[in-house]
Amino acid sequence: MAEQDLFSLALERKHLYLKTHYNNINNLEGMNILQKSLLYRTYLPFYQIQKEQAQQLDQFQKEKQSVHNNNNNNNSNNNNNNNNNNNNNNNNNNNNNNNNNNNNNNNNNNYNNYNNNNNNNESVNNIIINSEPVYTNGGNEKEDEKEYANIHSDKIKIDYVDLIGKPYILDKDGFLPPPLSKQEITFWVSQKLTETDFSIIDYYFNDIRKSDYEKKKHIKKFERKQRQKEKEELKLKEKEELKLKEKEKRKKEREEREEREKQEKQEQEQQQQPPKKKLKETNKSLTLSTTINNKDNNHNGYYYYYDNDNDNYNDGDDEKEKEKEKEKEKEKENENENEDENDTSMVNSEEWTEEEVNKMNEIRGKLSTADYNYWDKVSAHVKSKTAEQCQRKYNSRFLTPLKPKSKLKSSSKPGIPTSPITMKTNPHTDKGKRKIRQITDETIMKQKHDLFNSFKTTKRVDYLEPLDEVVTTTNDVENLDFGEDLDKAFSAVNVNYTNTNNNNNNNNNNNNNNNNNNNNNNNNNNNNNNNNNNNNNNNNNNNKERKRIDREHWDSYIRNSMGRFSAKPPPIKTTTTTTTTTSDSTLASINNINNNNNNNNNDDILKKPFSIFDESSQKKSAEIISKISSQCEERKKKEDRDVDEDGEDDYYFGGDNSKNGDDDDEII
């Protein structure tokens, strides 16, 4: 494939491309500089190339083809010689170089011959250019293009001087036609396009080094646009078809209405018409019953005639009714025409078009508001709006449209929990601190009953119930029979306590034995104690109702307890260590008392185990209980006493102040 074939093929394809976009080649006045540049790249060479130059180009192609074939033969011979003899390689290479130099000289001579020939210009149609490529490698286009890219890379650039000659044709702007570059030639040759595909080239004309991916992308966009156009056209057609169908439906409905109305009217007329009179059968000829004025010879009256066919007596009123029906039909036709116009253009609608607004503004400039029936004149000019609508539109200039209420978006995500307390002030100021103090006072939980409040307004809580409401009960302590078991238990404890104190210094071994025996006895009796405790718990659960305590009950309990423990234990007769034998019931009662105070102290046996039997502690507890009972009585007596001006209660200050010799002022 020759160099000139590439160039001519590129020009041809570029010529077709521009021909589709610019049909009028000769009209260059209305074109921009960019449009002219495209034309100068393609069309000017065709106008300036002559017929003789075209013939010489054909000869040049034939000569160059023969040279190309000789080069291929020389290369094949050189390859064979290289395999046989290594010494002959240098000679063959020199021969090949000489042959190549000769070919280059021949090419230069051919170019010089083209420059010497100058003839008159002719039209493009008379020019003949061989655009068909010549293949050397069995018709493979890709292999041929690779050869020319490698071998003839320097010679593809062809100037316009070699093909066209001088002088150039200049434009008014002084724009010269630039030559075709190597990239443009390779692009136009590689693109084998038809006239329908030239719209795609617009994207690649300026930048030829685009990738195949971008080309496919551009083609897809081009196809999408075509699909969108087709869809839009189909939608328009569908809308037109729907409009036609609606019109046909309306016509049919109108025709049906008219037919129904006609039938109804005919039925009504038949019902309203009176029965027609009949003449006598004897008079079958026309008769005249009118009064004739003899003076004027004019007929004044009604002419009655008789139909022989139907025997009906007819007047001239039927013709008038027919005329009225025709007039009504014409009125209906006019109304139907107006309905069609109303369907197409929404008459008396609240929406205003630009034409209606312009008409309204035109008349308002001509008329004055003081004119009679001002808005009626405006509506008459607008034609599609009433006077009220025109006035409403004019007054709407001063009104701002309402903004649509934005709906709150319901967020699916859980929001940040906010506190119900709103604090707008700065918390570091005095006002903010006061606000915080109020909030804390309101939010912090308080007790319902304030025990330390000395005022009467607060509700008091009675921790001990009044004596009137107490259920009277018998003194349970007096009726109890402790029996001999409890006395034996008290004596046994004291005996053990004294024995251990006497024998500490004399016999250590005996102490150990006694301790072991006591421990064993205690361990054996724990089981009995547990059984007794379980029985006591069951009895307590059965008696769920709590017994209320009376003052007499406390006093009797104190007397019995003081009289029982005031007696001293009997003296010890023997000093020797003896193991006292006690019954199981006495040991169980002892261990019941033991468990309340010494659950974990098994090793401290030498200590006195029972603090309840101390006389001093028992007296103190009795005194406290007696004070409580006496104060309860005093409190009930003072409930109805008067309150001081300050509202303070004397009870919380220890009764009357006069007893202590103190005044109210000193208390404060």
Curated annotation (Swiss-Prot):
Q: Where in the sequence is the signal peptide annotated?
A: none
The protein's name is: Myb-like protein W
InterPro entries the UniProt entry points to = Homeodomain-like_sf, SANT/Myb
Q: Which CDD domains match?
A: SANT
Residue ranges annotated for the Myb-like domain, each copy included: 344-398
Q: Which PROSITE patterns match?
A: MYB_LIKE
Q: Where is the composition biased (Acidic residues)?
A: 308-318, 642-651
